[in-house]
């Protein structure tokens, strides 16, 4: 059963209600739990930070069992195109879609750039750049009002679908590198919300320890 959880932001005791579960874009339309939540704060002046959005991260821990024991399991999950994932951003101020796309694209470009020439090829790099341009173009002339939710969801084949207020915007984009770089923005070592990433990493590690391995008497776990 999905409940609404309060995530506080700002200095006036305000909060945003975030669903305890979210339907993924996988074939089973799995009802994934909230792994962790947090607040994106952006520095706009030397002594001034503003809250931009509240985020919720959703996926099925049982789908991540293969990454147990890795140095950074959460980052591995972010870059695993076979694991369906969703992030839900609820904005606490009015913003333009272009400004959101630009900010996220900067992080994606950093991730893609850091991998250039390492295990990739010119064709895949070109494809990823084209996918990024498609991503940015979706937000042209889009206005995101306070209280609006923006979700980024990937399925098991590395296809990204974006929804604003529950309605799909633009075309779905199939590019594993883009999807990985996007989710690394919140799940990687250079996360824009490090407190949430640390919490999510800890929660995932604990959850993986409780999930039996698939080869445990040949029986897998149904734990979520």
Regions found by a protein language model. Name each.
Residues 1-164, 168-224:
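Terminal leader/tail segments of proteins
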């Amino acid at each position: 059963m999905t409940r609404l959880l309060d995530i506080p932001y700002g200095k006036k005791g305000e909060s945003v209600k975030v669903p305890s579960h979210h339907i993924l874009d996988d074939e089973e339309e799995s009802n994934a739990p909230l792994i962790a939540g947090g607040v994106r704060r952006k520095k706009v002046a030397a002594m001034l930070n503003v809250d931009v959005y509240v985020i919720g991260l959703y996926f099925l821990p049982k789908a991540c069992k293969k990454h147990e024991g890795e140095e950074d399991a959460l980052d591995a999950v972010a870059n695993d195109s076979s694991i369906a994932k969703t992030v839900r951003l609820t904005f606490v101020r009015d913003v333009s879609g272009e400004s959101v796309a630009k900010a996220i694209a900067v992080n994606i470009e950093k991730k893609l750039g850091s991998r250039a020439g390492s295990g990739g090829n010119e064709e895949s790099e070109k494809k990823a750049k084209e996918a990024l341009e498609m991503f940015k173009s979706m937000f042209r002339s889009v206005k995101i009002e306070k209280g609006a939710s923006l979700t980024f969801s990937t399925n098991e084949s590395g296809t990204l679908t974006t929804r604003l207020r529950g309605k799909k915007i633009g075309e779905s984009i199939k590019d594993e590198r883009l999807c990985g770089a996007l989710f690394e923005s919140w799940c990687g070592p250079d996360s824009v919300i490090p407190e949430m990433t640390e919490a999510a990493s800890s929660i995932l590690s604990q959850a993986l320890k409780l999930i039996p391995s698939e080869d445990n008497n040949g029986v897998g776990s149904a734990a979520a």
